[in-house]
């Protein structure tokens, strides 16, 4: 009986240590993902398709606020479009949820700029799905929904 009790206590102790280590690892990965989200926004404002190319996976799919769906090549081409002139993009209220080697980041955004000579000021929510592959996080899907025009 004593042996069983000791075994259970040791198992509980090591499980708590493993859970704490996992939380620490998740916190570190969460910080990385939040930084990458900010880098993504900076790259969009600077129309830096090369930086964005390094953040998104080869099978990336993007669903815009207006319902347009694009793959990686179209998304990157749109960033380079000279008629696309973003002035600012800010995110807030981000939350990261992990599912083993996948993470979902949700948050709110506000972006201002002009496209084809027309100004825009969008406020919305986004969902980005990131996968850890080849020792790095890459975004494989992004979706935005407009809250206010």
Task: Give names to the regions the model predicted.
Residues 1-5:
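Positively charged n-region of N-terminal signal peptides that target proteins for export
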Residues 7, 22-149:
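A beta-strand edge to alpha-helix "cap/lid" segment located at domain peripheries
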Residues 7-17:
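Bacterial N-terminal signal peptides
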